[in-house]
Amino acid sequence: MRISTQTDIIFPAFGIDEGMKIFKEAGFDALDFSMFYMNSSRESVLGNMGEDELVNKLLESSEKYSLPFNQAHAPFPSYRFGDEEYNKFVYEKLKLSIRIAGKIGASQIIVHPT
């Protein structure tokens, strides 16, 4: 069994590499990569990085600290009744989050419907 936690608070506050160090020192075996805020203009997951740069940073730190990503969380809510503008926007972010999850080796991604 692996002990895993979400990256939601630590990565935005400390950055990827320092965050990985914190998680490793705390005793975690794996991580759930949080992409919650890709559903708004607060895209703290990507920051100023492009998809490839983000994936490379995640993989480098994952290898450095021997902390794999066992799963990921997609942006949510993934659908809002009656809000087609949001739904079109978040649909593209859902596809992006699934792509990123696959590239970092997460075997599953959690998608909350609403």
Across the structure, where does each feature detected by a protein language model lie?
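Short, intrinsically disordered, charge-balanced linker/junction segments flanking boundaries
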Residues: 109-114
